[in-house]
Amino acid sequence: MKKHILTALIFLFTFGVSQVIYKVPIHDTIDLGLPPFIERSIEMAEADSAEAIIFDIDTFGGRLDAATQIKDAILSANIPTIAFINRRAISAGALISLSC
């Protein structure tokens, strides 16, 4: 899995001098405050014409209703999304990771 992420990152960095890539943290417990943050992050990345968004995930999970809202926002994104599982993505974190 790490090879695939590394390959994707190398690919993104080699085809342009000034590419914009957003890194969005998803750490700790997933609660209802996180979906609006993720939605704003995606909107900002799209407005900045970012090449991609990398979600840095390290969570034991949390509320599945919040994770479902995040999943829907990621699937609706108009730019590529990448899940970087930085240690763990359990339960709701796995759902979010799989939506990228």
Where are these predicted regions, by residue range?
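Sec-dependent N-terminal signal peptides
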Residues: 4-16
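Soluble extramembrane regions of membrane proteins in the secretory/endomembrane system
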Residues: 18-100
